[in-house]
Design a protein with these regions (language model features):
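Bacterial N-terminal signal peptides that target proteins for export
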Residues: 1-9
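Periplasmic alpha-helical coiled-coil/stalk elements that build and connect Gram-negative outer-membrane
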Residues: 2, 125-241, 337-340, 344
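Bacterial N-terminal signal peptides
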Residues: 8-17
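Bacterial Sec-pathway N-terminal export signals of envelope proteins
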Residues: 21-72, 97-100, 214-258, 299, ...
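Acidic, low-complexity, intrinsically disordered peripheral segments
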Residues: 22, 30, 393-423
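Hydrophobic/aromatic residues within transmembrane alpha-helices of membrane transport systems
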Residues: 36, 46, 94, 140, ...
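Amphipathic alpha-helical coiled-coil segments
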Residues: 45-60, 125, 129-150, 159, ...
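Small/polar-residue-enriched beta-strand and adjacent coil segments characteristic
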Residues: 66-124, 248-260, 265-327, 337
Length: 423
C-alpha cells in the first residue's frame, strides 16, 4: 500500500512539474523599440547634432559681413575740428569682400554633405540603440526561461525528495541517495536566487536604454521562432552598401573631399574687395562718389595654395581607401552573421522536432515502467534532468538566432523583411 502511494505521488509530481505555466503581462519588443527611438538620450543628442549641422548650411554659403567706415580728410593741423574740413572731404565708405566665383557654392556643398554625415551618424546611433534594446530584451527572455526551468526542476525535486524519504522509510534506497536529492534542491534554490538578482540587473539595463526609472517594473518578454530569414548574401550585401550608416558616412566623406579638392584649386584665383565711397555726407547735397576695387593675389602659391591642393588630393585618396576597407569588413560580417543565423535555426529545428519529443516520450515510458514496478528511479530523474537541459539549449538557440538577426539588421542598416532577394 505504501509503495503504491509512493508511485502515485511520484507520477503526480512529474506531471505537475512539466505542466507549470506562469501567467504574467507580456512585454512587447516593438513597443520598446518605439519608446527607445523617442526617449533614448543618445539618439536625441545625435539628432540635435544633425539639426545643428543643417543650420550651418546657409551660413557656409553667405558672404562675409560688409564694413562701413567714416573718413574725414585734410583736418587742419593741430585741431580736431571735423567741421572745418571741406564737405567733399567727409566720406562714408561701404566695403564688401567677394570671393572668386564658385567658392561659396562649393562651401555650401561641403556643408550639405557634412550635414548628411551627421544624419547618417544619427541613423547609426538609432540602429545601435535598437540593437542594444533587442539584446537586452533577449537576455531578459533567457533569464525568465532559466528561472522557469529552474522552478520546474525545483518543484520536481522537492516532490522527489518526499518520495525518496518515503522510499528510504521502506528501505528501498539508501540515505546517501536522499542526501544527494536534498543537495540538488539546495543548489537549485541558490541558482534561483542568483537568477532573481540577475533579472534585476537586466531590467535596469533595459530601462536605462528607454530613459526610464532604472527600477521600473517590466513584463515577461516573449520570443517567437517564426522570425524569417530568407534573403541571399548578394541581396544583403547590396542592402549594406545602400543603407549601412557607417558606409554612407565614408561615402559622404569621399564626396566632401571631392568638393574640398575643387575648392582648393579655386584658391589660386583672386578674391575681390569692392568699396564705394560717398563724399559730402554732411552737406545739404551729396557730393561725388568713388569706387575702389582691390584683389587678393595668391602670390605665395608655391608654399600655400599648392599644398592645399596636395592635402585635398591626399584626403580624397584616404577617404576612398577607407571606404573600400569598411565595405570589405561589412561584407565579411554580413556573411558571418548570416551563417550563424542559419546554424542557430537548424539547432532550433533539431531541438523542437527531434530531441525534445524524444525525451518527452522517454519520460512517459519511464514513468509507465516505474508505475508498474519495473522502472529505475534514478533513470527517471536523469531523463527529466536531460529534458530540462535540452529545453534550456532550445531557448539558448532561439535567443542566439534572434540575436544574430538583430546584429544582421544592424549591419545591413534596416529590417531584413525589407531586403529583396535577387531573382
Amino acid at each position: 500500500m505504501i509503495k503504491k502511494t509512493v508511485i502515485i505521488l511520484l507520477v503526480g509530481v512529474l506531471l505537475f512539474a512539466q505542466g507549470i505555466v506562469y501567467a504574467a503581462e507580456s512585454l512587447s519588443l516593438d513597443s520598446l523599440i518605439g519608446e527607445a527611438k523617442q526617449n533614448n538620450p543618445d539618439i536625441l543628442a545625435a539628432k540635435k547634432r544633425w539639426e545643428a549641422s543643417a543650420a550651418r548650411v546657409p551660413l557656409s554659403k553667405s558672404l562675409e559681413d560688409p564694413s562701413i567706415g567714416f573718413t574725414f580728410e585734410r583736418i587742419p593741423r593741430g585741431t580736431l575740428k571735423l567741421n572745418k574740413t571741406m564737405p567733399d572731404d567727409r566720406m562714408l565708405t561701404f566695403s564688401q569682400f567677394l570671393p572668386f566665383f564658385g567658392k561659396l557654392s562649393l562651401k555650401g556643398k561641403i556643408a550639405v554633405v557634412e550635414s548628411q554625415m551627421f544624419a547618417a551618424e544619427h541613423k547609426a546611433k538609432e540602429l545601435d540603440i535598437i540593437n542594444q534594446v533587442k539584446n537586452a530584451y533577449y537576455d531578459l527572455f533567457m533569464n525568465d526561461k532559466e528561472k522557469e526551468l529552474a522552478q520546474e526542476s525545483l518543484g520536481l525535486l522537492e516532490g522527489v525528495a518526499r518520495v525518496a524519504e518515503a522510499n528510504y522509510a521502506l528501505g528501498t534506497i539508501s540515505q546517501e541517495e536522499v542526501y544527494k536529492i536534498h543537495l540538488e534542491v539546495a543548489r537549485l534554490n541558490n541558482a534561483l536566487q542568483n537568477l532573481e538578482q540577475e533579472q534585476s540587473s537586466k531590467q535596469t539595463r533595459l530601462n536605462t536604454l528607454l530613459n526610464r526609472d532604472p527600477e521600473s517594473s517590466l513584463g515577461i518578454p516573449q520570443l517567437s521562432e517564426e522570425a524569417s530569414f530568407e534573403a541571399d548574401i548578394h541581396s544583403l550585401d547590396q542592402s549594406t552598401v545602400m543603407n549601412q550608416p557607417e558606409l554612407l558616412i565614408f561615402s559622404y566623406a569621399i564626396e566632401r573631399n571631392k568638393h574640398a579638392k575643387a575648392l582648393a584649386k579655386r584658391s589660386f584665383f583672386p578674391g575681390l574687395m569692392a568699396s564705394i565711397v560717398q563724399r559730402g555726407i554732411t552737406s545739404g547735397t551729396l557730393g561725388p562718389w568713388d569706387l575702389m576695387l582691390s584683389f587678393s593675389i595668391p602670390l605665395w602659391f608655391w608654399t600655400k595654395q599648392k599644398y592645399e591642393v596636395k592635402e585635398a588630393i591626399a584626403n580624397l585618396g584616404e577617404a576612398e581607401a577607407a571606404y573600400n576597407a569598411m565595405q570589405n569588413r561589412a561584407f565579411a560580417e554580413v556573411k558571418d552573421l548570416a551563417v550563424k543565423a542559419k546554424i542557430a535555426k537548424n539547432k532550433i529545428s533539431l531541438y523542437k522536432k527531434n530531441l525534445i519529443p524524444m525525451l518527452e516520450n522517454s519520460i512517459a515510458a519511464s514513468t509507465a515502467a516505474f508505475s508498474s514496478g519495473k522502472g529505475d528511479f534514478m533513470m527517471l530523474l536523469d531523463s527529466q534532468r536531460m529534458l530540462v537541459e535540452t529545453k534550456m539549449n532550445y531557448y539558448q538557440a532561439l535567443v542566439e538566432y534572434n540575436m544574430n538577426l538583430a546584429d544582421l539588421e544592424r549591419q545591413v542598416g534596416g529590417n531584413l523583411s525589407e531586403v529583396k532577394n535577387e531573382k
